């Protein structure tokens, strides 16, 4: 070594004094590669700086960065400024007046728009804007609606399976309230049952059906429509985000959220995407003009998941896009109307969990039991096991048996 050539003797390791702390084993000098025997702390009890006896250089034990991460505009390289912070993302904007993107967008404006822009610049979005999300796909999978088995065991209820089928038929298919269902069972069928028992049966059926419904393998098309409508939960507005296969009329998203924000739209899109074995390249969603859908699309683009979002704005066909996709928008509006008919007698829900329980029952009815005129008076999903009977209470019990078999198979350990 250089030390041995200069002093005609080998370099000795650092002398270890009793009671003193030295760098741990495995520590290596980043400059010359000397092992821990030749290293010692250079700033006393702080122990944040190490000196190497071989090369006589120092280095830090802590990782430090000269500056924070800087986000730059892809057009001009100018530093982006954070203009808004939301729960699940931050919005950054390029403020450079010489940015090529800004100049290009400015040239596209007409004389009237340029005059408006001078008077009110905030009415136009000409600068480069991007969102940085803090929600991962793993987090989306973890927060997917998971319903635990109900405390009510449907195999041990005091009433027969036929009564259970009648309860679900009147409560879900015909949109009756709990008390009206109890009344019609007593006055028409001479079955004495309380409205609370009906609520317990409905909750237990929903909890049993949900895993089977959520993981059912549909053969979906690439053309979907979506919309949100509000319901009341504890007197406050909550929002149902519906997604539906345009051609087959299959509901693919039906979760209720307390907020109508970008994250709710992201989660609604994700609940549809996870139902595809392979996401089609021509996947398209037709939605309204709410900006949360475009923001949700940007989130998936950053995750390298691509689909098209077409926004149909207003009630009239004022542009070619609205004229082309108006039928899809009308399909989701009719779905909202059908749901509102069932929801109207409920007068809201007492909890978000109870609201999602009803959504599970409604979606099961809509996808598997409700006949559609546009489908030749057939349900969106035809099951061979349901073709054997036209009796609706029997059909509900067949679906419950299918859900029970799925639950047993999914929880079985081999």
Briefly describe each language-model feature range.
Residues 1-45, 49-51:
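N-terminal alpha-helical interaction blocks
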Residues 184, 201, 362:
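Residues in the recognition helix of alpha-helical DNA-binding motifs
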